[in-house]
C-alpha cells in the first residue's frame, strides 16, 4: 500500500504490478472492498487488460454475495476471453452457473450448463442439466440429456438410473427402461431391494417380456413387506396357465396381507384351483372371497363369488354322477 500511495512518484510499471498484488492480498485477507478498489484502479491503468481481472472481480463480488455484480463481471470476462480466443476454465463456468442458480434465472442456468457438458463433460454437469430441464418442465430434453449421459457412461448413482428409467417409462419405452434398470442393478449402482426389483419387473411386463418379469417379481415378492407383488404374480401365472404357481403366489399374497382387495386374490386363487380340478379347495377360496366381499360391502365380487360357488357345486355333482355311472 505504501508503494501505491506514492502515486506519480514511482514508475508506472511498478505501480501497476503493485496494484494487482495488493488487490490479491486484500482478497486473501478478506478485505473485499480494498480488493475491489485496487483491482478497479489497476484496470484503468493496465494496457489492454485480459479477462482475468474481471473473473477476479466476479469472485470478490461472489464472496460479498452481490450476485448481480458478480454476474456482470463474469459475463464481461467471458466476452473478453471469447473475443481473444483465450481459455475459460471449468471453475469460471461453474461459478457463473451457481450465480444464475442463486438468482433462479433458469434459462441462463441451462445455457451455461450446456456449455459445461460440451466442454467439460462430467457426471455432475450432465445430471444437473437434466435436473433443471425436469424442474422447468422440459421432460423430453431431460430424457435426451440423461440418455446422452448414460451412453457416455457418466451415470453412477441409483437416482441417475432410476430417473432415466422413469422417464423412459413415461415415454412408453419400457424395454429400454428395463435394460437401464438391469444395467444399474448389475453394476450395483441400484440397490437390489423390493421397490427397485418391482420397477424392473413392471418394465419387463409392459415390454411384453413376461418370462423375464416373472423371476424378478418372485425375487421382489420375497423381500416385500406386503403381498402386493405376490398378487401381481398370481395374475401373471393365471394368464400363462401356470396354475400351481398361481395358487402359491395368491396364497403368499394373502398370507403377507396389505392388499387393496383381498377378495380379488381369493378369486384368482379359486380360479387356479378350479383349473386344476381341485374343486373343494377352489370352493373354499370362493367362500372366503364372498365373506370378505360381504364385510367390505363389495356387492360385485360378492355376486361373482356366489356364482362360482354355485357353478362348482353343480360341477361337483356332475362329476360325482359321472363317477357313479362309470363305477
Regions found by a protein language model. Give the residues of each.
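Alpha-solenoid helical repeat scaffolds
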Residues: 1-276, 281-327
Amino acid at each position: 500500500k505504501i508503494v501505491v500511495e506514492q502515486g506519480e512518484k514511482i514508475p508506472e510499471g511498478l505501480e501497476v504490478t503493485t496494484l494487482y498484488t495488493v488487490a490479491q492480498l486484500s482478497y486473501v485477507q478478506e478485505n473485499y472492498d480494498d480488493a475491489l478498489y485496487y483491482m478497479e484502479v489497476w484496470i484503468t491503468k493496465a494496457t489492454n487488460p485480459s479477462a482475468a481481472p474481471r473473473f477476479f472481480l466476479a469472485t470478490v463480488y461472489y464472496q460479498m454475495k452481490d450476485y448481480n455484480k458478480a454476474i456482470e463481471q463474469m459475463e464481461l470476462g467471458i466476452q473478453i476471453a471469447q473475443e481473444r480466443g483465450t481459455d475459460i476454465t471449468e471453475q469460471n463456468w461453474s461459478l457463473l452457473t451457481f450465480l444464475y442458480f442463486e438468482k433462479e434465472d433458469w434459462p441462463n442456468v441451462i445455457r451455461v450448463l450446456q456449455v459445461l457438458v460440451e466442454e467439460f463433460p462430467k457426471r455432475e454437469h450432465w445430471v444437473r442439466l437434466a435436473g433443471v430441464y425436469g424442474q422447468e418442465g422440459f421432460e423430453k430434453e431431460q430424457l435426451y440429456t440423461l440418455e446422452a449421459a448414460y451412453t457416455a457412461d457418466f451415470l453412477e448413482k441409483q437416482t441417475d438410473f432410476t430417473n432415466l428409467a422413469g422417464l423412459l417409462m413415461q415415454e412408453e419405452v419400457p424395454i429400454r427402461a428395463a435394460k437401464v434398470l438391469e444395467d444399474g442393478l448389475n453394476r450395483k449402482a441400484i440397490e437390489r431391494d423390493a421397490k427397485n426389483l418391482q420397477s424392473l419387473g413392471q418394465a419387463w411386463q409392459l415390454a411384453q417380456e413376461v418370462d423375464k418379469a416373472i423371476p424378478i417379481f418372485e425375487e421382489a415378492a420375497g423381500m416385500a413387506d406386503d403381498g402386493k407383488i405376490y398378487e401381481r404374480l398370481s395374475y401373471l401365472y393365471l394368464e400363462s396357465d401356470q396354475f400351481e404357481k398361481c395358487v402359491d403366489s395368491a396364497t403368499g399374497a394373502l398370507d403377507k396381507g396389505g392388499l387393496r382387495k383381498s377378495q380379488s386374490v381369493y378369486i384368482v386363487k379359486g380360479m387356479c384351483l378350479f383349473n386344476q380340478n381341485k374343486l373343494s379347495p377352489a370352493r373354499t377360496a370362493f367362500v372366503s372371497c364372498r365373506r370378505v366381499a360381504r364385510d367390505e360391502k363389495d356387492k360385485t365380487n360378492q355376486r361373482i363369488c356366489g356364482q362360482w360357488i354355485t357353478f362348482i357345486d353343480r360341477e361337483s355333482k356332475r362329476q360325482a354322477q359321472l363317477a357313479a355311472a362309470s363305477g
